[in-house]
Amino acid sequence: MPCGCGTSCKCGSGKCCCGSTCNCTTCPSKQSCSCNDGACGSACQCKTSCCCGADCKCSPCPMK
């Protein structure tokens, strides 16, 4: 079951978190992902799949 989008959602540990303590710039997915370099930050984005590049942003980092 996918979570909703908005400021109340975030991705982490491969799961979706919706609540006052959650925050995500994009709609997250329950699927886990990781960047090839294993680094997190602006290079990682969690959607239906993992995308790594300058056009990706996500906070916090998706599951390593």
Curated annotation (Swiss-Prot):
Cu(+) 5 binds at residues 33, 40, 44. 14 cysteine residues are arranged in C-X-C groups. These are thought to be the metal-binding sites in other metallothioneins. Cu(+) 3 binds at residues 11, 16, 18, 27. GO terms for molecular function: metal ion binding. The keyword Metal-binding applies. Cu(+) 4 binds at residues 44, 50, 58. Cu(+) 2 binds at residues 5, 9, 24, 27. Cu(+) 1 binds at residues 3, 5, 18, 22. Keywords: Copper, Metal-binding, Metal-thiolate cluster. Disulfide bonds: none annotated. The metallothioneins are involved in the cellular sequestration of toxic metal ions and regulation of essential trace elements. This isoform binds exclusively copper. Belongs to the metallothionein superfamily. Type 2 family. This is Copper-specific metallothionein-2. It comes from Callinectes sapidus. Cu(+) 6 binds at residues 40, 52, 56, 58. It comes from the Eukaryota.
